A protein has these predicted regions:
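Short, well-formed alpha-helical segments that are part of the catalytic scaffolds
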Residues: 10-26
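Acidic helix N-cap motif at the loop->helix transition within catalytic regions
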Residues: 14-18, 39-48, 96
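Conserved sequence signature across two-component system core domains
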Residues: 9, 33-35, 59
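Cell-envelope/extracellular polymer assembly enzymes that use nucleotide-activated donors
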Residues: 2-4
Length: 130
């Protein structure tokens, strides 16, 4: 199974570098989509330009997270990846959980798999199975 991590970002220059560095400890290949950021996001991405395992897709105007995800998934497929794990660039997702999601996908007996991770699925009032 050929995985990459997809990181859509919009004006998350303060957290993006840390998220990329943490992601690289658990996944070799990253696709970052810069969704028209106007802060220092492009500068942060530039510090990773030597890393050939990081692909950056940028466009000048913000088009929303959904657009960024679609474009990132398309780029991941073009690069030959079979699976993508998405991680938000603001720090609300933990890159260290990526191997857990990859393992679930590997253990599935399906040709197409969607694995959703959530820290809140066992919260009070939530059904045991969603």
């Amino acid at each position: 199974m050929n995985f990459c991590t997809l990181i859509p970002t919009y004006n998350n220059g303060k957290t993006l570098g840390n998220i990329i560095e943490r992601t690289l400890t658990v996944c070799n290949d990253i696709v970052v989509v810069n969704d028209g950021s106007t802060d220092n996001t492009a500068e942060i991405l530039g510090t990773f330009s030597e890393n050939k395992n990081i692909t950056v897709v940028s466009y000048p105007n913000n088009k929303g997270k959904g657009y960024a995800l679609r474009l990132g998934l398309q780029k991941a497929r073009e690069l030959g990846f079979d699976y993508s794990v998405t991680v938000d660039s603001d720090g609300q997702h933990f890159p260290e959980d990526i191997p857990l999601l990859q393992e679930e996908a590997k253990n599935a007996n399906e040709s197409r798999v969607l694995v959703v991770g959530s820290r809140n699925l066992k919260a009070e009032g939530m059904p045991e199975k969603n």
